[in-house]
């Protein structure tokens, strides 16, 4: 009897988890211009424009402090340093607002080589983790995933 109750409780718990899961980029409408394969073909390694100031916070994996450093560098118009720090906060610590900012920088070519495919990919990944604005931006740029 205890096993049956435990199984029912686990089933109810898992059903609740599934219904609250974030919507993924896979659920995006198929109205865009680019397929996933086309997107992956267009992604290029990050090429920074100018010299980079690095932060100890970013080197040590402190995502929140790294994002603060990136915001500071961005406000000083040191876009290469900001892009490098946003990348560290996004990739290393999963600070998704940093991913959004880096995607925007790829879109505009601020501190990095302008690359719409890199921007779409960052928006797509951030959308997968439940950031609705990222989903909207990804669709605006033409991703049909």
What are these regions (language model features)?
Residues 1-17:
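Sec-dependent bacterial lipoprotein signal peptides
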């Amino acid at each position: 009897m205890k096993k049956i109750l435990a199984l029912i409780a686990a089933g109810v718990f898992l059903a609740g988890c599934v219904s609250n899961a974030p919507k993924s980029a896979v659920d995006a409408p198929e109205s865009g211009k680019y397929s996933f394969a086309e997107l992956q073909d267009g992604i290029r390694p990050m090429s920074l424009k100018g010299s980079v100031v690095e932060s100890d916070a970013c080197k040590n994996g402190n995502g929140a402090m790294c994002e603060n450093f990136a915001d500071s560098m961005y406000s000083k118009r040191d876009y290469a340093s900001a892009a490098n720090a946003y990348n560290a906060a996004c990739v290393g610590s999963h600070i998704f607002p940093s991913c959004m900012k880096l995607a925007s920088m790829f879109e505009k070519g601020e501190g990095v080589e302008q690359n719409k495919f890199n921007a779409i990919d960052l928006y797509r990944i951030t959308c997968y983790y439940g950031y609705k604005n990222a989903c909207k931006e990804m669709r605006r740029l033409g991703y049909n995933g």
